[in-house]
Regions:
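ATP/NTP phosphate-donor binding region
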Residues: 1-98
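Residue-level signal for inorganic ion chemistry
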Residues: 17, 39, 77, 128, ...
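Solvent-exposed alpha-helices and their adjacent loops that cap or buttress functional pockets
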Residues: 31, 92-94, 117-119, 146-147, ...
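Generic secondary-structure signature for well-ordered alpha-helical cores
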Residues: 90, 159-163, 168-175, 183-195, ...
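Short glycine/serine/threonine-rich phosphate/pyrophosphate-binding segments
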Residues: 106-113, 134, 246
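A glycine/threonine-rich phosphate-anchoring loop and its flanking beta-alpha core
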Residues: 113-202
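C-terminal charged capping/lid subdomain of soluble metabolic enzymes
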Residues: 183-186, 277-352
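Active-site segments that bind and position negatively charged phosphate/pyrophosphate groups
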Residues: 198-305
Length: 352
């Protein structure tokens, strides 16, 4: 087992190792004095892992209840959030108890938001089962639900007590969901780790899972340590997301998050090359690795349709938006951009 320690407003460990799921009960018992744990999962993940995790928690002496919701981004909404709060009340969880998210990013965001707001905060554990959640959304303390105006517009910063990453979970992932995670992995390499980028070009993600997870969470740990509340350098982690959220919204969330981030990265590096902020070689190298991992790189939507969602981006401040722009492989910068120029960036990136 590998351990990455995070020191933020709450210090905790990210543990990475095969078979961790079966020992989740003892791992959780060691970091919390909770008597009761609410497992939060979706109806795709629960049949695969819910029983094993429940048994592990019960064997460790914990009382377990569960909340299972329909899988998909559409469940990351106020309605499901309120249903979860009602379930916590019905099961009489107290401040001494805990919520454990079992699943991908939607489960983690939803459970984390509930944990941070129910009784003004109870224990929270992340047990991610997708590559995307392991390398990104389960680490760093961001929780959120979506609003009609866009993604992640209501949320909190709330660090978990513990994160358990079991690469064995990834063996059951459909290939398209695995590819989604690869988009976030490539994001880390592009924004700040050229040697890691070379590793990804040289081999497949399946062959180096532990290395990939440890590298990504360590990078995120280091960035979060400098800027826990997303006011400065942490915004670099949103590479590909500003335009990606516009793509998700325009597709009615038919385009997955990872695919949208991949297209968003490709758009941003194309625009950067068009505006002289990176070389054409950098542009082509980034687009090529996305293609190597069978990720989409072309935008099918009109700039006019994407614009409203992009302008609602969390990195907007007044009449400007901070764009995360690649300047070389392994280097990005934050470019403060007038809202009036965002349409030009979308078109330069390839929006119709």
């Amino acid at each position: 087992m590998k351990t990455v320690s995070v020191h933020a407003s709450r210090s905790y460990e990210i543990r990475i190792g095969r078979g961790l799921l079966q020992g989740a009960g003892e791992q959780i018992r060691a970091v919390t004095d909770a008597k009761k744990v609410m497992l939060v999962s979706d109806d795709a993940v629960w049949p695969l892992y819910g029983g094993a995790v429940r048994r592990s928690l019960e064997t460790a002496g914990l009382t377990v209840c569960s909340f299972v919701f329909p899988h998909g981004e559409s469940s990351k909404c106020a309605c499901t959030y309120l249903e979860l709060l009602d379930a916590l009340c019905a099961q009489q969880l107290t401040r001494k108890d805990a919520i454990a998210a079992l699943g991908g990013g939607v489960a983690g965001d939803l459970a984390g938001f509930a944990a941070s707001t129910y009784l003004r905060g109870i224990g929270f554990i992340q047990i991610p089962t997708t590559l995307l959640a392991m390398v990104d959304s389960s680490v760093g303390g961001k929780t959120a639900i979506d609003l009609s105006a866009g993604k992640n517009l209501a949320g909190t910063f709330y660090q978990p007590w513990l994160v358990l990453c079991d690469p064995d979970c990834l063996t059951t992932l459909p290939e398209d969901i695995f590819r989604d995670g690869c988009a976030e992995v490539i994001k880390y390499a592009v924004l700040g780790n050229a040697p890691f980028f070379d590793d990804l070009r040289a081999g497949s993600a399946h062959a180096q899972l532990e290395h990939i997870i440890e590298t990504c969470v360590t990078m995120k740990r280091d960035i979060v340590a400098q800027d826990e509340f997303d006011r400065g350098q942490r915004q670099l982690l949103n590479l590909g997301h500003t335009f990606g959220h516009g793509i998700e919204a325009c597709s009615g969330f038919a385009v997955s998050h990872g695919s949208a981030v991949a297209i968003g990265m490709a758009m941003m590096v194309r625009a950067a090359a068009a505006f002289g902020l990176c070389t054409e070689k950098t542009r082509d190298t980034v687009v090529d690795i996305l293609r190597q991992y069978d990720l989409p790189v072309d935008c099918a939507f009109r700039a006019e349709d994407m614009l409203p969602t992009v302008l609602h981006d969390k990195k907007a401040a007044g009449d400007t938006i901070n764009l995360i722009v690649p300047t070389a492989v392994g280097q990005c910068r934050i470019v403060k951009t007038p809202a009036s120029e965002i349409m030009d960036w979308l078109r330069a990136g390839g929006a119709r």
